[in-house]
């Protein structure tokens, strides 16, 4: 993520901690209890304020009857990136809605990468765009997520 893009998202935390350190602490705390993402073999490659990049390899048990990756698995990858992106400020945040567009199939062995970017964060509402690409950089899914922050509930104790 570019420095300019990152600066647009950063806010000064009340505790004075570095925003990137907060995002890393949240990632570690969330991922250790995220059985779904871990069971699907997801790897969290990078997190930052309002940002996350997560990858997974499409396995045979993720294929549908057409021998392509079931859309639910790709959506789950995008949703996990969304979760790590919108919770990166250490304020417990949940999805209030998503819209998913399937652009291309993914196949067994494909390496999919979901990248989440914050579009807007105002009050307790956020909007995030997530793009899933394959190992060739081809867009497979785009998703827009709306989030709702739960007042006064940190993700991890810092």
Which stretches of residues belong to each language-model region?
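Terminal targeting signals and extreme-terminal segments of soluble enzymes
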Residues: 1-158
